[in-house]
Amino acid sequence: RDNADSVRWLREACDLIGAHLVHVSTDYVFDGMLDRAYREDDPTNPLSVYGASKLAGELAAGPDATLVRTSWVCGAHGGNMVKTVLKFMHERPTLSFVADQRGCPTFTADLAPLLRRLGTGGFTGVYHATNRGAVSWYEFVRDIVAAAGGDPEMVLPITTADLQPPRPAPRPAN
């Protein structure tokens, strides 16, 4: 509900001042059952309350907004998977990550200019914005560890069913 209400309030504020709304959403609006990358016009089917609330936010943004769906966001500022892995690789002998969920990492240094371009260029509608190439969390973490000079063999593959504790919001597998 918060994801819908906050977007509705932003849309109303934008309407009052004549600003264009760019709303960032997520791949959680899909169920992950396709074996290919999702397209903007694919039907949504969220698996979790979070995904449903993000979809409600997309609807609350209205038809004149720019909706940008992204995934696996990481960058120099704020918390993200890359920073978590870099911390854990020095604290733990092994790291276990799921090999049965795939997605596209998205770097903020690439996403931010695109959001600006979409927001100022008169674009409306739904856009998917990620970096190229899909990987599993397991593959992504192995690459992070290797790039940081660590041993990628310290990263062990597990399945989503093996996660302990289970994730609070079911994540689409693709």
Task: Annotate the PLM regions.
Residues L114, G121-R167:
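Mid/C-terminal beta-alpha module of Rossmann-like enzyme folds, strongest
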